[in-house]
């Protein structure tokens, strides 16, 4: 395929997605290349709706096939929170540390076995035709009592993956891309592209 727009200006996210799909497209853009689009209002009622909003708005503006993702961190003992508000759990215009600190405070005193959680990533694709679709990736884990590691972004330092025995923030990018919620969703996205376009 010729080109695609990743409907995000988050450098970490764009890099993670580009790493896995670069061989499928001759040119990959991000919202950094279309700054005039501005911030896309994510007012859906689910991560699926928010992802489709981003990919549709981006396609409508660029007329280039667009892919977007939205991710929720769902903590069982918090009834699925932060959920839809994962990126702004501690408020608007906050840092990753602000969000993690609020989460750790909310779970203060909760034993490890009750700190189960999952990352859920939904990726949507819009090309203006009949090929719009979505895929989902889920990574199960636990919320640590304190931050571990300095790699990655978002909640990675507090998300522990039992199968690997480490937090996402202590994994190399290769390992993380292989097992992460976004990595799983991107692999499903690539499979769907293969089916639709015989890439």
Q: What are these regions, as identified by a protein language model?
A:
Residues 2-5, 11-199:
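Anionic-ligand binding patches
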């Amino acid at each position: 395929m010729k080109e695609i727009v990743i409907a995000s200006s988050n450098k970490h996210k764009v890099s993670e997605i580009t790493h896995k799909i670069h061989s499928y497209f001759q040119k990959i853009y991000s919202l950094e290349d279309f700054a005039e689009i501005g911030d896309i209002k994510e007012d859906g009622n689910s991560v699926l709706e928010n992802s489709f909003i981003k990919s549709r708005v981006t396609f409508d503006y660029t007329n280039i096939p667009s892919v977007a993702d939205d991710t929720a961190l769902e903590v069982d003992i918090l009834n699925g929170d932060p959920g839809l508000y994962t990126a702004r759990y501690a408020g608007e215009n906050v840092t990753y540390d602000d969000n993690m600190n609020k989460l750790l405070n909310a779970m203060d005193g909760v034993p490890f076995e009750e700190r189960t959680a999952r990352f859920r990533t939904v990726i949507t694709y819009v090309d203006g035709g009949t090929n719009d679709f979505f895929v989902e990736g889920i990574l199960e884990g636990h919320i640590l009592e304190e931050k571990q590691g300095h790699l990655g972004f978002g909640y990675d330092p507090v998300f522990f993956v039992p199968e690997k025995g480490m937090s996402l923030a202590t994994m190399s990018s290769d390992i993380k891309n292989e097992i992460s919620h976004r990595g799983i969703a991107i692999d499903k996205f690539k499979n769907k592209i293969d089916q639709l376009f015989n890439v």
